[in-house]
A protein has these predicted regions:
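Short, structured segments at the rim of ligand-binding sites
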Residues: 1-436
Length: 436
C-alpha cells in the first residue's frame, strides 16, 4: 500500500495535457471481443483499471499488442471461453467493475457469458438491473450462482426489440449496444445514455460494420449484422481529468493551460466551474485558467442559494461533484451540492471539515458549503481515500493547504489518473509517493 506526502501551498503554473478517457477506454476495449479481426485503439490511458481489464482480456485469449505506451492492437480470434468458469477468473473480475462491460460482447458473439459480480468504487448501490433487463429483452436467460457469486447468461440467438430503459445507465447502455449489434433484427433503445463515451462507442462499432443510428440522442436504433470486422479508434481526452485540472488551477494555480481538451465534448463542465466564479477561458481546443485570487459563487435570479446537482448527460457528471465541492470551500458565498446518483459519495466531506472547511452534510445526498474566500486556508491532515473521485478532490485540498498532508490508499487515484504526482510536480506541486 502506498501514500502521498503533499507539501501544500505551492502555486501551480504551466501546461498539462489530459490522458485518454478512462470510461471510454473500458467500453471500446471490450468491443474487441465482438470480432476476430484486429482492432487498434490509441490514446489508451495507462491506469490501473484499464490495465487490469486488458489483463483480463489476455487471460481469456485476446491477443494484445502494445504498439506504444498508449497504443494497442487487440485480436479475439482464439478465445478460451472455458476460462470464464474458472475460480481464478471469477476472483479477478470481482475486483474490477469494468469487467461488467464484457457481458454484452460475449453474449452477442458467443451466446453465453459467466462473469463475476464486479467490484470498483465503494460509493453505494450501483445496480446492474439495467444491463440484465436489456439482455432479457433481447432474449437472454440469466441465473445468479450465489455460491460462486457469478452471473450465468445464455441465449441461443439474441433478437432485436424495442426497450425503454428504467435509467439512462452509461455502462448499461454500452453493454446492451454491444450485445445488440450482432442480434437478429432491429433493436430500439429509448432513454439510452448519450454521453460522448457512448457516442464514441457507437462510432467505433459503425466503423467495425455495425448499423447504429440516433447517435448523440437518447433514442438509438441498431440493425443487427452477421459479422463485425477490424477498425481503428482514438479515445477522447478524459473530461473528468480536465475538470479535475480546472479545480486544481482554481485552488492552487498561478495560470494553467489544459491542452487539447476536445472542448465540444466537455458539455456543461466549464460552466459548472464558472457558476462557482472560476474564470475558464476557451482558447482554440485548450482551456486557460488564470490565477484566481477570489471567485464568487453565483446565486439564482430570485436570490436563493446556488445548487449544483448531477444529472445524466448533457447534465453535470457525478464524477466531478467532489472536485467542485472542494473548489467551493475557498469561494465567496454558499452553494448546495446535490449528489442524486450515488448515496455515499459525499461522505468524504468529514475529512475536509477536519481540514477546516465549512460544510454541512445534510444527508447522504446533499451538502452545503460556505466558502472561506481564500481568507482561511485549509489545514493539512492525514486521510485515507474512499474512492477515485474523492481521492483527487482530497489531493487538491492537500495541495492548497498550508503544511504537509499524508493521503493513504492512493491506489484509488491510480485507478483513474495516470502518473498524477509526476505530472503535477512538473507544474510546481510537491508530491512524494511513499510505501506504507
Amino acid at each position: 500500500m502506498e501514500s502521498f506526502i503533499i507539501e501544500g501551498g505551492h502555486p501551480l503554473q504551466g501546461t498539462i495535457t489530459p490522458q485518454g478517457a478512462k470510461n471510454e477506454a473500458l467500453q471500446v476495449i471490450c468491443t474487441t471481443i465482438l470480432t476476430d479481426e484486429p482492432v487498434r485503439i490509441t490514446n489508451v490511458p495507462d491506469i490501473l483499471d484499464v490495465n487490469n481489464l486488458i489483463k483480463l482480456l489476455q487471460e481469456i485469449g485476446v491477443k494484445v499488442t502494445r504498439n506504444s505506451r498508449h497504443d494497442y492492437t487487440f485480436q479475439s480470434d482464439e478465445l478460451k471461453l472455458d476460462y470464464l468458469d474458472s475460480l481464478e477468473f471469477v476472483k479477478k473480475c470481482s475486483s474490477l467493475r469494468g469487467s461488467v462491460l464484457m457481458f454484452g460482447p460475449l453474449l452477442g458473439r458467443f451466446g453465453k457469458a459467466t462473469i463475476a459480480k464486479p467490484g470498483g468504487d465503494k460509493i453505494g448501490r450501483r445496480r446492474l438491473d439495467t444491463h440484465f433487463l436489456g439482455f432479457k429483452y433481447l432474449g437472454a436467460n440469466f441465473v445468479h450462482d450465489e455460491e460462486r457469486n457469478v452471473y450465468q447468461i445464455q441465449a441461443k440467438k439474441l433478437k432485436g426489440c424495442y426497450m425503454l430503459l428504467d435509467e439512462a445507465s452509461v455502462t448499461g447502455t454500452a453493454n446492451i449496444i454491444m450485445a445488440a449489434v450482432l442480434a437478429k433484427g432491429t433493436t430500439t433503445i429509448y432513454n439510452a445514455a448519450c454521453e460522448p463515451y457512448i457516442q464514441q462507442l457507437c462510432h467505433l462499432l459503425n466503423a467495425m460494420g455495425a448499423q447504429i443510428s440516433g447517435i448523440a440522442s437518447n433514442l438509438l436504433t441498431i440493425v443487427g449484422v452477421e459479422k463485425l470486422h477490424g477498425a481503428e479508434h482514438r479515445i477522447l481526452p478524459d473530461m473528468i481529468e480536465v475538470g479535475s485540472f480546472i479545480g486544481m488551477a482554481a485552488m492552487c494555480g498561478a495560470g494553467i493551460r489544459i491542452k487539447d481538451v476536445s472542448v465540444k465534448d466537455l458539455g456543461i463542465i466549464p460552466d459548472a466551474f464558472r457558476r462557482l466564479g472560476v474564470k475558464v477561458k476557451v482558447e482554440g481546443d485548450d482551456l486557460f485558467i488564470p490565477e484566481q485570487k477570489h471567485y464568487v459563487i453565483d446565486s439564482f435570479i430570485d436570490g436563493t442559494i446556488m445548487t449544483l446537482a448531477d444529472a445524466p448527460w448533457p447534465g453535470l457528471t457525478p464524477d466531478l461533484l467532489s472536485v467542485l465541492l472542494v473548489v467551493a470551500t475557498q469561494a465567496r458565498g454558499s452553494v448546495l451540492f446535490h449528489q442524486k446518483m450515488f448515496e455515499s459519495r459525499l461522505f468524504f466531506v468529514d475529512k475536509l471539515i477536519d481540514m477546516g472547511a465549512q460544510i454541512i452534510l445534510c444527508d447522504p445526498h446533499r451538502a452545503v458549503v460556505v466558502g472561506h474566500d481564500h481568507k482561511l486556508k485549509l489545514r493539512p491532515g492525514r486521510m485515507t481515500i474512499p474512492d477515485i473521485r474523492a481521492g483527487i478532490a482530497l489531493l487538491i485540498a492537500a495541495m492548497s493547504a498550508n503544511g504537509t498532508s499524508r493521503i493513504a490508499n492512493i491506489a484509488q487515484i491510480d485507478r483513474g489518473y495516470e502518473d498524477i504526482e509526476q505530472r503535477l510536480n512538473q507544474l510546481g506541486a510537491k508530491i512524494t509517493r511513499v510505501s506504507d
